[in-house]
Amino acid sequence: MTTVQEPPSVAPEAPPVSPQPSPVAQPPAAAFPAEWTVADVLEQLGGVPLHRVRAVPPPGMATEKDVLEAKSRIGRICELVDGVLVEKTMGCYESLVAALLIRVLGDFVEKHGLGIVLGEGGTLKVLPGQVRIPDVCFIAWGRFADGRLPPEPIPAVAPDLAVEVLSAGNTPGEMQRKLRDYFQAGVRLVWYLDPKVRSVQVYTAPDQVAVVDQQGTLDGGDVLPGFRLGLPEFFARVQTSAPGADKEAEKET
């Protein structure tokens, strides 16, 4: 008897699968009301001059990452305000004043083991989506969870004392906005140091200010008990010329 072998069964071919369309990227939500103009955005920022507002990323879309990239790629120091990169401006003389204040504050803070003092590179996330860079600031050790400065390039911490050295590029609205942000974040004391008239505006709240004039003495209040700085002596230490250079210039004239 002959056995007939059945041919192997062949599975039917699956019908062709239509390619799935690529997902369409959704545009980001508008950061500002649709009816706003650039003028409205600038007013929101406190009347900051247009040349200090970065166009990339588009205003309202910037993040903390963009703050770091602006510094590393194009050498611009920017704060993050409402999703907008706003350049910090400081002239050489203002930077010199800030540097001396860092030395004076730093010596006091180190001597008493109070915390740390940062300069104009101290980038801090003071509020969600708000990155501020005080020209000088003091942060007590108690502000840090484990008593250490966090390793992140932009730590989420508000200073106890924030100092801004005023320059020609600052606007009154900008500085008022900073006051609101600082105190909302938990800053206890703000100094606005005006090197032009050699005075300091001392804020303990956005609407509570005392002015120390050029002959006065600045103190640390409850934030830095025992700290005192005579403004005449301080500004006398801000050297803008080599020792004896002024006398030589007088001889030449």
Locations of the language-model features?
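Gly/Pro/Ser/Thr-rich low-complexity, intrinsically disordered segments predominantly at protein N-termini
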Residues: 2-253
